[in-house]
């Protein structure tokens, strides 16, 4: 039901060998989709399910559960059908409903209410995940090419929050650098060093264990090159502790990367000039305009000049110009020429269209 490629991404050796030199970000393509349970197919049950789907999608778009506590959310929920694109039952499961929303309309609502908005480009993390069986004490490491109930629960939780993890492939290079004891013991430096080959900005390590019939404990840390956080969650089921872990991780990342849309409400958007080279025809120009306006940080993009194969745009931003630069590079559609950290270049950013 939850497409693995959009959630916990399993990376092959070839991808690692030829990976890009810059920090990886995932493009999350299903932010406007939600799966919800539907026990009966009467009209009232469907309306309730669609409202639940709306809440799930709004949390994904914002990155924070605070969005559904906003004073205007109830009014949005009461008019939910204005934002629904389609609904369909999941193949082979008549109790699961897939609801797809108009993402652009929902993002406009988020901006109008000055709530955080998290774009589709989201930082990836290499996830070392180990679980210990309560009875046998046997330990399992989640890795490339394998599937089990724990991974399914993780996939579902990640889909519901719009985040992505990369699992280690555990080839000879991985097992030489990182052992089962390292993961179980959560040896921070060893795991962070072992994750560097995956070129992700974050390393996450999870240790999951069942303490008794109705007691589960999940210990985890999140580390970047400059930050470290350690946490522990407990609950009565595996489903609950995995859900809490993903919720906490997502809320953490959203506070760092989601856009503050107050500029939209105050009509104080920042304007930035950018030029894009290698625009060879009208088709490429149309693709560029569509791409720029699809970015959450961009309120609108106006073509100012076309000179030869170089297009100059005035872009109205909801965030800082440096944020736009990083989003553009993460999207892998352009090659940067300008260094935005150079004060002499801050007025005009320059790129090549791929």
PLM region spans:
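Bacterial N-terminal signal peptides that target proteins for export
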Residues: 2-11
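N-terminal signal peptide c-region/cleavage motif recognized by signal peptidases
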Residues: 20-23
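Amphipathic beta-strand/beta-sheet edge segments enriched in Tyr/Trp
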Residues: 30-39, 198-244, 325, 348-353
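Short, well-ordered alpha-helical segments
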Residues: 31-76, 241-253, 283-294
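N-terminal segment of the mature soluble domain
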Residues: 50-72, 123, 127-134, 140-184, ...
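Signal peptide-directed extracytoplasmic domains
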Residues: 70-131, 136, 140-145, 149
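A short, hydrophobic beta-strand-centered structural micro-motif
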Residues: 79-89, 166-169, 182-219, 328-346
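C-terminal soluble interaction/assembly domains
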Residues: 249, 270-354
């Amino acid at each position: 039901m939850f497409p693995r490629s959009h959630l916990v991404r399993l990376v092959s050796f070839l991808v690692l060998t030829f990976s890009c030199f810059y920090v990886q970000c995932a493009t999350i393509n299903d932010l406007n989709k939600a799966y919800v349970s539907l026990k009966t197919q009467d009209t009232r049950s469907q309306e309730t399910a669609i409202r639940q789907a709306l809440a799930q999608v709004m949390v994904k778009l914002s990155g924070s559960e605070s969005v559904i506590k906003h004073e205007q959310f109830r009014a949005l929920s009461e008019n939910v059908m204005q934002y629904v694109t389609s609904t369909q039952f999941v193949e082979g499961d008549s109790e699961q409903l897939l609801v797809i929303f108009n993402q652009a309309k929902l993002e406009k609502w988020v901006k109008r209410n000055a709530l955080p908005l998290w774009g589709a480009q989201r930082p990836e993390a290499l996830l070392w995940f180990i679980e210990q069986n309560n009875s046998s004490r046997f330990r399992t490491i989640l890795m490339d090419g394998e599937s089990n109930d724990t991974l399914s629960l993780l996939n579902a939780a990640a889909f519901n929050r719009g985040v992505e993890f990369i699992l280690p492939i555990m080839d000879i290079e991985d097992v030489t650098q990182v052992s089962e004891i390292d993961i179980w013991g959560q040896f921070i430096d060893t795991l962070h060093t072992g994750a560097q080959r995956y070129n992700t900005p974050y390393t996450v390590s999870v240790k999951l264990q069942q303490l008794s019939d109705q007691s589960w404990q999940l210990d985890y840390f999140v580390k970047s090159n400059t930050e470290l956080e350690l946490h522990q969650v407990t609950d009565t089921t595996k489903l609950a502790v995995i859900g809490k872990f993903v919720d906490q991780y997502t809320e953490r990342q959203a506070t760092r990367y989601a856009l503050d849309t107050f500029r939209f409400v105050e009509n104080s958007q920042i304007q930035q000039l950018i030029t894009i080279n290698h625009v060879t025809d009208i088709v490429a120009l149309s693709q560029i305009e569509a791409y720029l306006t699809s970015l959450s940080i961009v309120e609108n993009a106006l073509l100012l000049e076309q000179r030869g194969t170089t297009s100059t745009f005035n872009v109205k931003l909801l965030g800082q110009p440096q944020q736009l630069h990083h989003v553009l590079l993460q999207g892998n559609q352009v090659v940067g020429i300008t260094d935005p950290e150079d004060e002499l270049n801050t007025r005009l950013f320059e790129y090549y269209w791929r």
